[in-house]
Design a protein with these regions (language model features):
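Mid-to-C-terminal alpha-helical segments outside catalytic/metal-binding sites
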Residues: 1-68, 77, 128, 258-263, ...
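Divalent metal-coordination and catalytic microenvironments
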Residues: 11, 69, 78, 112, ...
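Active-site beta-loop-alpha junctions enriched in small/polar residues
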Residues: 11-13, 83, 115-119, 141-145, ...
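A short acidic (Asp/Glu
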Residues: 18-20, 90-92, 125, 186-187, ...
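Catalytic pocket-lining loop regions of alpha/beta-barrel enzymes
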Residues: 23, 136-137, 151-266, 273, ...
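Well-ordered, non-membrane alpha-helical segments in soluble/globular domains
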Residues: 56-66, 92-100, 159, 191-193, ...
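Non-catalytic positions within long, well-ordered alpha-helices that form the structural scaffold/packing
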Residues: 70-71, 131, 167, 257
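Active-site gating/metal-coordination segments in enzymes
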Residues: 76-189
Length: 353
């Protein structure tokens, strides 16, 4: 809870990129790119936000995840994403089974996403199995390698039966990585324009575009303007808030202009970066006056409340007041209250509620 408001991080990962799990040089390159993002975007001059690559970053410890997200951080809930990448990792970078085990540790706070490769011959059966595991949505990773194939498109007819199966099962939230390329994957495979067709064909589904299409923000905004079931997740974009505030301001102004305040979703991409400095900086952030004037938008406290939790809660049918009441007094909440009481307010990453 931040300033008395519900917080839900819509983009986090529980990954294993340990040397033991890496199949080849591509698995090493993938996690090394993540770590380059980590060091490159961290708040300048604040060493407390830098993780040790071998001890902390490569393989996420479940206790550390919960402590960082819900005790040292102000999130009330979080979504565990999935990027399987079986060509790079023996058991996958992340996977639904690992998510399901993690959720058992904090079932009232965590939501898991499944991950399907539509090129797999048993893709439909995987949808069923992962929903049975408890996954509440799906993460689609269009640049994933599979043998000689170097990716697929969200508008390929082979994917349509999977969308339809999700609808039949009552799964409505489709999360897509449409943003920066991660070595060795190709940027063109994350082109956001392939969302256009399925988002219009399947109005029953919500298309949550992680990283809001960056660097193709214009394409994302134009297609989203006509598709009310397309949403922008701020993961990665939000990481610019501290060191590149004007860049972030332009991203936010475009999203507010084209999509409005009800379709922008908070996500930190933790553990690429610690979540708390991103949340603190977002809550303190104001659009520069010239950008407000140009776009005719404002980043108000009411809008921030929607972004940090209200919008994603609505998509997952979560009553935020009831959820906060449910979480009040659980073990993580008690420890967070103790942390808040003992921590003086600071700048980035203060964690003050």
């Amino acid at each position: 809870m931040k300033n008395g408001k519900f917080v839900m991080d819509a983009h986090t990962g529980f990954w294993d990129a340990s040397a033991e799990n890496c199949k080849n040089k591509y698995g090493e390159a993938f996690v090394e790119t993540f770590y380059a993002f980590h060091t490159g975007f961290n708040p300048g001059g604040q060493a407390q936000w830098t993780m040790d690559y071998e001890k902390t970053f490569r393989k996420v410890d479940p206790d550390w995840y919960l402590e960082t997200m819900f005790v040292q951080g102000d999130a009330d809930m979080a979504i565990l994403s999935t990027q399987v990448l079986m060509d790079f990792y023996h058991t996958g970078f992340t996977n639904p089974e690992r998510n399901a085990e993690m959720i058992k540790r904090a079932p009232d706070r965590l939501i898991g996403l499944g991950g399907i490769d539509p090129r797999a011959p048993d893709a439909l059966e995987q949808v069923d199995r992962q929903v049975e595991l408890g996954m509440k949505g799906f993460k689609w990773y269009t640049a994933e390698w599979r043998g000689e194939s170097r990716g697929w498109k969200a508008n390929d007819p082979m994917v349509f039966p999977l969308y339809e199966r999700c609808i039949e099962l009552g799964i409505k939230n489709m999360h897509f990585h449409k943003g920066p390329a991660v070595e060795p994957l190709a940027l063109e495979r994350f082109d956001v324009r392939d969302i256009d067709e399925p988002s219009t064909l399947y109005p029953e589904l919500n298309f949550i575009v992680d990283h809001c299409g960056l660097p193709r923000l214009d394409d994302f905004c134009w297609l989203s303007a006509r598709s009310p079931n397309v949403y922008a997740s701020l993961a990665v974009a939000l990481a610019f808030v501290h060191n590149r505030p004007r860049f972030f301001a332009n991203v936010m102004a475009n999203l507010l202009f084209w999509l409005g305040p009800d379709r922008i979703i908070y996500g930190t991409d933790f553990p690429i970066w610690y979540p708390q400095w991103q949340l603190d900086d977002l809550m303190a952030f104001q659009l520069p006056a010239d950008i407000e004037d140009e776009f005719g938008v404002s980043l108000t406290d009411e809008t921030k409340e929607k972004i940090i939790g209200g919008n994603i809660a609505r998509l997952y049918d979560i009553d935020t007041a009831a959820k906060l009441a449910q979480l009040k007094g659980d073990a993580l909440d008690v420890r967070r209250d103790e942390r808040v009481a003992s921590t003086p307010s600071q700048t980035a990453g203060a964690g003050a509620r």
